[in-house]
Curated annotation (Swiss-Prot):
One of its GO terms (cellular component) is gap junction. It comes from the Eukaryota. This is Innexin inx1. Keywords: Cell junction, Cell membrane, Gap junction, Ion channel, Ion transport, Membrane, Transmembrane, Transmembrane helix, Transport. It is found in: Cell membrane; Cell junction, Gap junction. It comes from Schistocerca americana. One of its GO terms (molecular function) is gap junction channel activity. The chain crosses the membrane at residues 29-49, 110-130, 182-202, 268-288. Residues 1-28, 131-181, 289-361 are cytoplasmic. Its main location: membrane. Residues 50-109, 203-267 are extracellular.
Amino acid sequence: MYKLLGGLKEYLKWQDIVTDNAIFRLHNLFTTVLLLTCSLIITATQYVGNPIHCIVNGLPVRPINTYCWITSTFTMPDAFLRQVGSEVAHPGVANDFGDEDAKKYYTYYQWVCFVLFFQAMLCYTPKWIWDSIEGGLLRTLIMGLNRGLCQDDEKCMKKKALIEYLLRHIKRHNMYALKYWFCETLCLVNIIGQLYLMNHFFDGEFFSYGLRVVAFSEQSQEERVDPMVYVFPRVTKCTFHKYGASGSIQKHDSLCVLPLNIVNEKTYIFLWFWYIILAALLSVLVVYRAVILAVPSVRPILLHARNRMVPKEVTNAICRKTDVGDWWILYMLGRNMDPMIYGEVIADLAKKIETPSSNNP
């Protein structure tokens, strides 16, 4: 297991050429690794240990454990408000008195590791799509100018090739930028969709899960119900039917301990907060991209902020002659190139872009 977890760090390696945004990487890399780690830990706990222990009189324990694991267990919701030790044996565990409608069934626990793995794949999908679309364009354009260690002749040759490319392909990068911003929007759609998925998976209990956990400590001892125990009960009931010696159907109640829910409750309270934070960050990012797209006047400001060595007059001149896609290419070049070389490229580009014939070398 340690080897498997150690292999996940490869996804978090620093990229020498950055083609995306930090929030984009939080979604695609960190969240993917987080979900895969949780899935591996829960899988190891579930299939290496014993995820359920049922107590029943007069029947072999192993078949009962298997039956209750693959079917479902239940609690009585009204029993969570009763006093443990005097009114009920455990939170949520009480006599059902034959009232099937009052039972709350738990069927999720055997699927948690698979759902987490599926969520990890969903989080990685936008990165896979973007890597396929990007195709190494920025790496090709930079040509090692991110390190600034090349000889003067080599540097001049690479700068000239880069400027010629930018002039030749001016106003042809809009789809490049729009496809990347689409992938960022896809991240937001994915996170919101996964919140709904988890809420459905936990029978409508996930949306308010984190808020109830926070409010739990502020409630009075007599009135509060631990939301983690309610959603992830440690002790539940299971009913097993079998034929007796005379052929009559016998009903056997068993008390089932679910040690795996100790891991599940901690996993999902962290995921609740992380997904809310990530959804907020992605929402701000999508609005920010919309402003860049709709308000051209902010582009030279951002381009100047990327490299303070480039005068505002130069960024204004460039942004007047280019589209949003060209601006995005220049902005990303500024994130990756040596600042001195980048300043020289922008200055030379601004001079040539003002010449009408420069667009058709």
